[in-house]
Regions:
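Acidic, Mg2+-coordinating catalytic module of metal-dependent nucleases/exonucleases
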Residues: 145-166
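Nucleic-acid-contacting surfaces of polymerase cores and analogous helical-repeat interfaces
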Residues: 142
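Conserved RNase H-like, two-metal-ion catalytic cores of nucleic-acid enzymes
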Residues: 2-135, 139
């Protein structure tokens, strides 16, 4: 590991498109079902721009499956069944940072994590002085996260490429 954290320009697999149609949702569920290991999960909201705490983008990654950027509002309008998603991930451990922020929105959508690992709680238990996601990622992986879109209006459509890269 170098002394200076490395900023990743974009994901190894490239910047993913948003999954906002029923066929794309079903394809992604199939990808997840045939993949393995833990499920990294995150959600983005538009709290500073809209009333409510609903998720406007949910993000997932699992070994053997691509990065999934899912538009829960568009998928709900299309009739997506989150039970298909739940079956696809099974009892995989969901990895979240500050899960108290994201779990209510996941539950509202119908996602049902069976097992959970919270990296913020782990960082606190390990005695890290800085336990935000960027600090934890830098500490353990030597990677710098770009955080310029963390407070963006995630309800905006279509999502710009640099937001999808975030």
């Amino acid at each position: 590991m170098t002394d200076e954290p490395k900023l990743l320009a974009e994901p190894r697999e490239g910047v993913p498109n948003v999954i906002d149609t029923l066929p794309a949702f079903r394809d992604y569920c199939s990808e997840l079902a045939s993949s393995h290991g833990s499920l990294a999960a995150d959600a983005e909201r538009a709290s500073g721009f809209r009333y409510g705490h609903e998720d406007w983008l949910v993000q997932f990654k699992r070994d053997g499956a691509g990065i999934g950027l899912l538009d829960p509002q568009a998928l709900a309008a299309a009739g997506a069944d989150w039970n298909d998603f739940n079956r696809a991930v099974g009892d995989a451990v969901w990895i979240l940072h500050d899960s108290l922020q994201d779990l209510p929105g996941f539950a509202e959508l119908g996602m049902e994590p069976q097992r959970l690992f919270d990296t913020e709680i782990a960082a606190r238990l390990l005695g890290l002085k800085r336990f935000g996601l960027a600090a934890v990622t830098e500490h353990f992986l030597g990677l710098t996260l770009a955080k310029e879109h963390s407070a963006a209006d995630w309800s905006y459509r279509p999502l710009p490429r640099d937001w999808r890269n975030y």
